[in-house]
């Protein structure tokens, strides 16, 4: 059913057997009985709005829009594009939505892992605007996700992942962001596909530009050890922790050697 207003969409979604339709890339693989499918395509949620202070990404924006947006690239380099580049193919990314990727809170989500490390909020119809880090751990309900909001700030951002094949789900995914927060150098680490959903860790570290690689490795080891990992068909918990340590080291080294955004 094509909703005419957000209020109508929210009311329809309260029914037990109703589902909000995103890109249908994940929903179509399920076997749940769905009585009402709610289409949000006429509610203006398919644009990325940029202001002086934020990027506001509509829930119905596609991953391809996220990948190609020039403003996001100028602010965060290639990090945003990198987090979606390996997701199946261009045709898939032209249909899969950002809202579906975030609302699902999937363990394998590259998009969730990347955005969690940034200064990101979600806008809910009933729940208002809350931090993405809070939303990730919130119990799933029947609220509507309207947009994802990224606050602009001078931050350095890196994203990387390990996959068994190019377009497969990640074995591990890591995002590293650093910037000045209240005058203190802060580092944010997000690790996803553990295989649990992404989790966030914050450290207030003032790291000198002339730090040695061995010292960076020690920082990366500390960070990787503070996340919980699990075992599945793609890898063991120990293997994932090792990969996370390697990726975090590479991302931290890249940020430090190439210069931090605010310096």
Predicted stretch roles:
Residues 1-263:
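C-terminal structural segment of proteins
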């Amino acid at each position: 059913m094509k909703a005419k207003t957000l209020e109508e969409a929210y009311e329809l979604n309260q029914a037990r057997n109703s589902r909000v339709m995103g890109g249908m890339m994940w929903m179509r693989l399920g076997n749940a009985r769905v009585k009402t499918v709610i289409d949000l395509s006429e509610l203006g949620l398919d644009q990325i709005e940029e202001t002086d202070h934020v990027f506001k990404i509509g829930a119905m924006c596609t991953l391809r829009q996220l990948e190609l947006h020039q403003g996001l690239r100028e602010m965060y380099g290639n990090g945003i594009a990198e987090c979606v580049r390996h997701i199946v193919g261009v045709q898939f990314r032209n249909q899969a939505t950002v809202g579906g990727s975030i609302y699902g809170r999937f363990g394998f989500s590259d998009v969730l892992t990347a955005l969690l490390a940034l200064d990101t909020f979600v806008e809910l119809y009933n729940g208002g605007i809350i931090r993405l880090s809070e939303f990730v751990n919130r119990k799933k309900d029947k609220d509507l996700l309207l947009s994802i909001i990224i606050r602009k700030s001078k931050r350095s951002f890196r994203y990387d992942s390990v996959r068994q094949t190019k377009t497969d789900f990640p074995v591990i995914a890591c995002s590293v962001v650093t910037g000045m927060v209240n005058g203190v150098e802060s580092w944010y680490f997000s690790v996803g596909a553990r295989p649990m959903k992404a989790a966030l860790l914050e450290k207030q570290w003032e790291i000198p530009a002339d730090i040695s690689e061995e010292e960076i490795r020690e920082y990366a080891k500390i960070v990787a050890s503070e996340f919980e990992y699990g075992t599945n068909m793609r890898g063991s918990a120990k293997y994932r922790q090792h990969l996370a340590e390697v990726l975090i080291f590479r991302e931290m080294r890249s940020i430090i050697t190439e210069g931090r955004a605010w310096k």
